[in-house]
Amino acid sequence: MKRFFAFLLIGALLFTACAAQTANAEKQPATAAPASTQAAASQESTPTAALTDPTDAARETTDAFSITTDNGAVSASGSVYTITAAGEYTIGGALSDGQIVVDAGEEDEVKLLLNNASITCTTDAPILVKNAGEVTVKTEKNTYNTVSDLRTGGASAASEENYDAAIYAACDLKLTGSGTLIVTSTYDNGVKSKDDLSVKNMTLKVTAVGNALKGNDSVEIKSGALMLTSTASDGIKTENTDVSSKGNQRGTVTISGGQVDIYAACDAIHAAYNVEISDEESCIVNLYTTSYASESTAAAGTEQYLIVPSSLYSEDYEYYVYLYNEDDAAGAWVKCTYDTMVYSGRTAYYGLAYRTSGSYQNLLWNLVPAGTAPDGTNYVAASTGETVNGSMNAYLITSISSGVIAGDWVQLSSGSGNSNKTTYSAKGIKAANEILITGGAISVYAMDDGLHANGGDALENGAAGLGNVTISGGTLSITSADDGIHADGALTIDDGTVAVVDSHEGLEGNVITINGGAISVYGDDDGINACSGSATPLLTINGGSLTVTTPSGDTDAIDSNGNFSMTGGAVLVRGGTQMGNMAGSVDVDGSITVSGGTIAAFGGICQIPSNGSVNTYVSNGTSFAAGDYQLKDASGNVLFSFTLDTGYSSCWIALEAFVLGSSYTLEKDGTIVLNWTQSSNTEGATGNYGGFGGKGGFGGHGGWGGRR
């Protein structure tokens, strides 16, 4: 579940159009050093090598098709083979335009053993599980198997009988085995379970128009080599957020091992509840969205929205769109599903999403009782047919009167954030509650936020999404067109290596806490931004090694709409060049309190640590050229070392090791640049460094940004 905030201009809901552009590839990340006397050092960060495409047409079987079992029950009707009992079924050979159907008992466990099988279908899901307790699809050792859904026209959600995946299961589905499975869907999803979906050991390649992997209740990847491509939707997706009868929370995506490479037109991982990544089995995750995903097509124009005033929305009714052409050929009914909240000023609207292939020129809307499949006559209200407006991405219902739906086309956009980001959601990892990373090697290339946790939206379990991101281990490298890591709630880094290589705003959250880890951040607006939310904005650094870099000009390396507190760690700030206003090295609305650790802040001076902080030295007007620096005491002991990659003319340094009456030097490549005796709590240049503080809410300059 997601939340949009929009502006009402000239009678239309506007979401600013944003062209996807490749991020500046010349910016290099910094990898932090663990020593408390050393700042994070700049170095190139590269992802783990992508998987080799396992597709091998020469291995695809042309043998005669067979399905055998010793303890089950299977029948054939033409090229459709139906399994009706628990057991193991070995499937091999080529089944052209055929289908494997499982329609067994509620508690039956069915295993499909793929032994060099090739299954294609142009009319339905090639592997369809209508009913069973649990189904396992296993690839036998060293075998090569393909499942191809060759239906055309795009999926319709008009009824429960829409089996919208190449491998579709109405029950728990497990994919396992030490062979290879190639899944292709030109229709919609690649592999889908209405319940839980898990993958273990298998070499799996999925290419789909819709989601590559979808488990309505959960998706779990334990091991294997997975190459997942969605050319017009998400890579991995979950849908439900309620609690099962056994007390299990639904909606989580879990990755604990193997290598997972995802290429997605929209979000690489989209969880209705949590995303949890650990390193139980050498976990590697490489994520690419939109223009970074070479096989994806532009998603703009494929996902459309129906905007419904809250007074015209009820869970007792459902909206459908009928897409058709004037040639009298059969059209398609598509269900409009809740996707987001849209706000115009203080007016709330429900944003319902539907997907169209773009091949239809006309549409009409139907409102039907919940659970009813529309047929064009059983509606409560309907619109007259009209032409699709290809230049707009949403239709706003303005009234329903005497059974007639009326409205107009509008354009949705985020209205804030980076203009290089996409107009639709194209995040690396997105969760409606929390993102929890305890291990693994994770690389993200996203034309939107790298990691994003939504907060505040109502979940089906009765709670509101927390919007938290917690990193306690692993290695992350993030290149993003908007925020590197965004948390509507709390962003906490306890350990691990985090490199935000390129971003609009590097780390953004309501409450940001850094307890440890090796962290480097580059943001072309703010490096770190503690911004408005449900709690008072706060940035706290208790430990770790951190380097934050922003380009010269109107930028803040550290920006807090509240306070900034530091009790430990080593921090190097390389910020904007303006001073005494809204840009610089550290810019806060409240106060800066440094009670421990080391921080050197280069760039425009907006604020300095408050009285009662550790001793601070301030320099204004000194030339600090690019190079390697060491801060030493009178005995020559190195207290702090760091590197500047460009020149600065002002800085402040706060250090718990500064002692009143003691002398210190700052040396560049062995040459003294500064020397002083610390005779007071604040030594060196003085002045009123007040400043205006933070730049507004999430995503940019003034108010909440459009976040999906």
Show where each model-derived region lies.
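Insoluble glucan recognition modules
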Residues: N211, Y288-K421
